[in-house]
């Protein structure tokens, strides 16, 4: 079963990362306040980015990976600046 990982922009300016096996249905649920508690409180939401996977578990793993990313790293992904991702992943422990 196919899966999708997606990033939404919520009305409070925060990103919401999720996964689903039906992108159209899930986006409609979020827009109608039937999605996650977080998006329900921050309507409307806008779909900014998604990736398609051959299996839903792969989409779920990708969701969990991206949820741990910084805002700047998520924005680089959304904006197609994948060459910036390694640099944004590095931590500066010297400061």
Residue ranges and their predicted role:
Residues 1-36, 40-52, 60-64, 82-95:
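GIY-YIG nuclease catalytic motif and its immediate N-terminal context
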Residues 64-77:
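Short arginine-rich
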Residues 56:
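C2H2-type zinc-finger recognition helix
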């Amino acid at each position: 079963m196919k899966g999708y990982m997606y990033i939404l922009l919520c009305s409070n300016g925060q990103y919401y990362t999720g996964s689903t096996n039906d992108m159209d249905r899930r986006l409609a649920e979020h827009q109608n306040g039937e999605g996650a508690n977080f998006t329900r409180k921050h309507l409307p939401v806008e779909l900014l980015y998604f990736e398609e996977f051959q299996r839903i578990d792969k989409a779920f793993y990708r969701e969990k990976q991206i949820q741990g990313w910084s805002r700047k790293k998520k924005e680089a992904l959304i904006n197609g600046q994948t060459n910036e991702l390694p640099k944004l992943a590095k931590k500066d422990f010297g400061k």
